């Protein structure tokens, strides 16, 4: 029997901002809209997004990242010890257009407030539906927060400090009733791919070493914390199709990841191109794998039959009840999809999930 609490109809928290919110952000930057006006626009956008997600039947609802100016702002805005913006560097070059705004860790890192407490509170004010909150993983932020040429020890220390901060935030979110937290780290997706590992080497990076170092930080979020029974904490490695998976996965980095990753839920890419599908054979039994089946970059809808065949292929390698279905990453404004196109993509995920699990969801 399917487990309702495995959240088979999945997504990645990030959604395409509505036109009204995009216009409000632009007006705020021009000084034509005050902070209160921007918050009102964010509140309206989140309320609309929650309603849409509920109608789509998604297992948990998010705020779409509509309150965040950039992917790492949840950390940068609430943690002291970050300095100026960093430009360039090997990791940023590997990520390419996917690289977020980065700031250098220059001093002791300490939380000055809750990272996502305001987001959780605002969601709880508009719905009693299960909530999804996404945070950047400590390993990801650490790799992006050290200037070029700094020793790996600096990255490890930064990762450990961030793991403690983010771990406390995850525990606080779980305690106040958030059902599902995703730690977002697309750098894994680049490093695990054969083409990405090759490009990393060209940039002077050792892919397996980076994977090990990030896992040490990300795994530390779990240290000494007991979560509620039906709380989910997952690791999201998806890149939204940005990583080149045409040559499959790199054996060394993949083995390092599969052997050490401690999470009970991971989000991976599982495209139509067979060699680009995340290898499921090495996944630890009992881990729920959320398959990224629907592309967030293209407006064209995938074939239902073709997606079903991919799920069937995955189910031949692992228990189908340990599979969830999703897109291949979060939706963003940069992807260029309209709100209607986004809804159709998510509706496709929901439709296929109900084909497999039906009324059990």
Where are these regions (language model features)?
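Domain-level signal for soluble alpha/beta catalytic cores
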Residues: 1-361
């Amino acid at each position: 029997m399917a487990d309702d609490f495995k959240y088979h109809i999945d997504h990645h928290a990030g959604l395409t901002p509505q036109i009204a919110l995009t216009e409000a952000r632009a007006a705020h930057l021009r000084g034509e809209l005050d902070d209160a006006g921007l918050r009102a626009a964010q509140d309206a956008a989140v309320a609309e997004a929650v309603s849409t997600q509920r109608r789509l039947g998604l297992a948990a609802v998010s705020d779409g990242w509509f309150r965040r100016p950039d992917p790492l702002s949840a950390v940068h805005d609430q943690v002291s010890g970050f300095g100026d913006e960093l430009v360039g560097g090997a990791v940023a070059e590997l990520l390419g257009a996917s690289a977020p705004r980065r700031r250098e860790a220059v001093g002791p890192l300490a939380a000055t407030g809750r990272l996502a407490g305001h987001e959780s509170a605002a969601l709880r004010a508009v719905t009693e539906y299960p909530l999804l909150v996404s945070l950047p993983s400590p390993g990801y932020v650490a790799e992006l927060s050290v200037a070029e040429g700094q020793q790996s020890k600096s990255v490890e220390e930064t990762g450990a400090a961030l793991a403690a901060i983010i771990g406390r935030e995850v525990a606080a979110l779980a305690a106040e009733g958030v059902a599902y937290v995703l730690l977002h780290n697309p750098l894994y997706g680049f490093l695990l791919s054969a083409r990405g590992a090759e490009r990393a080497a060209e940039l002077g990076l050792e892919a397996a070493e980076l994977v090990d170092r990030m896992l040490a930080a990300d795994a530390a979020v779990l240290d000494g914390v007991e979560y509620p029974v039906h709380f989910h904490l997952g690791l999201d490695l998806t890149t939204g199709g940005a990583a080149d998976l045409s040559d499959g996965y790199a054996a060394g980095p993949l083995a390092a990841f599969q052997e050490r990753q401690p999470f009970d839920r991971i989000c991976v890419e599982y495209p139509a191109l067979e060699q680009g599908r995340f290898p499921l054979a090495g996944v630890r039994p009992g881990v729920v794998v959320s398959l990224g089946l629907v592309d967030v970059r293209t407006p064209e809808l995938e074939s239902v039959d073709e997606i079903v065949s991919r799920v069937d292929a995955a189910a031949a390698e692992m228990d189908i009840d340990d599979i969830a279905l999703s897109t291949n990453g979060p939706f963003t404004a940069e992807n260029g999809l309209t709100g209607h196109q986004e809804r159709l993509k998510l509706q496709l995920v929901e439709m296929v999930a109900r084909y497999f699990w039906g009324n059990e969801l």
